[in-house]
Amino acid sequence: MDYDVLILGGGIIGCAIAYELSKYNLNIAVIEKDYDICNDTPSINTATIYDGLECEDELSSKLIRKGNLLMEEYALRFKVPYKRCGTLYIARNEIQAISIDKMYERAKAKKIDDVKLLIGKEILEYEPNIEGNIIKSIYIPNTGVISSYDLALAYGEIAFDNGVNFRLQEEVESINSINKGFKIKTSKNKFTCKIVIDTTKDKNLQLVNENNKEDDKGKYMKYVVIDKPYEKLYSNIIFDVRENERIYIRPTINNETIGAYSNYKNVHYDKVIEKIKPLTKEISENDIKVVRDWRLFDEPIIIQDDIINSGYINIKVNHYAKVTITPYLALNISKLVVEKLNCKFKKDFNDKRREYFRFKNLSNEERNKIIKLDSKYGRIICQCEKVSEGEIVDSIRRPLGARTVTGVKRRTGAGFGSCDGCYCKDKIIEILAREMDKRVTEVVNNSKDSTILLSRIKEFDEM
């Protein structure tokens, strides 16, 4: 066999499973069709760590709660920015209050004692700055926020350093059963393996039949980053409970404020501001720093591991709490594989991620020390987010380094500022071209057909 395990899909779950399996004496590959890994994490590099009480599906709720309990351990291990903060689900009328009561009943049924049902002004004890006529709320203490892309990258980078082969820009075309394994045909090659772990959403590749119909019922999520420190507004995440809508406000890891609104219609961002205004006090268009879109799914989680004896595991997590679920799910899938293949732990497993610098978070003394070692850190490329050339170069040279403008942007924050990359994008393209030994016209934004500079008016020796 070419590989012991082939993981289809290099999203956060595929990378997390690769990390857990890289601890053992296995030959592993991850096949990802995109230029980069972890493209399924939100472009705004902060995800909510949920508790599971808001979820009615039993399996989803269990996975979320178990993942929540593991998250702090993994964040500390990988040195990923992570912040614990409580969540308040609020109801402004009797209809909304029914949802609050259901959540509280679920908590009692599961013997979860750390949630609190608050009536009327009791909420002010937990969030004194909240305004409006709130008749009922539920307080959940063990939620939080995490740098989701950093977490996903950490999984991938450590797996790569421990021997996992990441095959990017390679699309799976077919999977066929053979004696004691599978034959995989991709757009570039053919492989055999003992076990396939399919984390993709492409039903055409799945060998098992599902009763669930494939659909696209995801909600449209609109994020707005508000130019106000979150600590001046609230200390907890605030969810305004609505039927078929999600309205919330939460901090980012950098203490910025995110307001979010979602429903099944792709609304204009003016509607988003209107919806989140009751939670954000006085805001205007001038307070909006960045606007981003995302798709929000709440589909049942499918984990078909009952056919592990045949060597095929199908995982489908099209769910808003995917980041929260990941640690527990990956740990359990790896246990199944280890038991199936009877493999042993690597003595030379390296569980450390290579360090990196966030220049804007350092003191002047720390900055000067780094600049003495590498002068590239003394040249600021992104003025909005204070990202240096040294950070961009490091993001390209790291394990599974950036190969696109979006890859640099997500790893470093360059281009996420109020100018949305107008000032720094050309410079990022130059650095990418130089580091990859390519022409600037060959550098892409995020995918094969997303070239930014189409042609040159005149050829120069340098750009």
Go through each PLM region and give its residues.
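Helical element adjacent to the flavin cofactor pocket in flavoenzyme catalytic cores
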Residues: 138-187, 191-195, 199
